[in-house]
From Swiss-Prot:
Quaternary data: Homodimer.
EC identifiers of the protein: 3.2.2.-
Catalysis: reaction(s): NAD(+) = 2'cADPR + nicotinamide + H(+)
PROSITE patterns xref list: TIR
Functional note: NAD(+) hydrolase (NADase) that cleaves NAD(+) into nicotinamide and 2' cyclic ADP-D-ribose (2'cADPR).
Disulfide bond sites: none
Name of the protein in question: 2' cyclic ADP-D-ribose synthase BtTIR
InterPro entries from the UniProt entry: TIR_dom (IPR000157), Toll_tir_struct_dom_sf (IPR035897)
Keywords assigned: Hydrolase, NAD
Source organism: Bacteroides thetaiotaomicron
Positions of the record's site feature: Important for ADPR cyclization: 226
Amino acid sequence: MNSSYYQNQINRLEKDIADLQKKIADENKKEIDKNKQIDSVHRTINKNTSISTLNSKQRQIDGYQKDILNCRTKIASYQKSIATKSAELGKKRQELLKAQQSEQKKLQDDQLKFQKKLQSEIEIQKRHLETLIAQNYSTQNNKLVSTEDIPEPTKQYDFFISHASEDKDDIVRDLAEALRNNGFEVWYDEFELKIGDSLRKKIDYGLSNANYGIVIISPSFVKKNWTEYELNGMVAREMNGHKVILPIWHKITKDEVLRFSPSLADKLALNTSIHTIDDIVENLKNL
């Protein structure tokens, strides 16, 4: 059973106990009221009270005492039910704790597996980038590189924007334009890609020649293969001691980012829910 199942049972038991405690309080109040009624009857009896009236009042008192006994019987029954449910509540709380510990262990195991998988992919991408850079350097020296492989002249970028296409209209296009309007060189696919270009080669070139990589992390981003390819390339550069990745969270929660990449969730990030495009540009100016 998962923790939600036990939590629901605990909530039900706590409600049952609270209801029983209210019933006990109600019965205690009834008992107090009946005792007051008995006292009231006693105060009406004096030396002039006739035998018939006295007998009537005694029957009245007996009825109140019977009501009091009934209240006490109900209270005892409610207290017994509370004791039973309290014992069951304690058991369910222990079961909830075990379920939570089991779920936490599973989450940690899943995160560890993901980190190992990510580390393996990063190593592969790192080797790929190192090979690509070495090949580009070699072909440049031998003047054998084509204009398709490396644009001439070599262009340096301030920022490479990694994003999912679904986020272009929401944030990415406006951010790219704002950065360019503020004098930054920006690698953004709508600025750089032309018909017939090799997407992989253009991305590799942008990653290799950008000072920073802006990563627009969104629910769409974490599902894309190309964005993961770009992110792995940036992580490979960071492993060489350079701060590269600048995360911006867009319509995504910390838990979602943590499931995608624990190391990425640990980075200080801007968030489009609280930062405007102007705020983001101002923060990037201070790098």
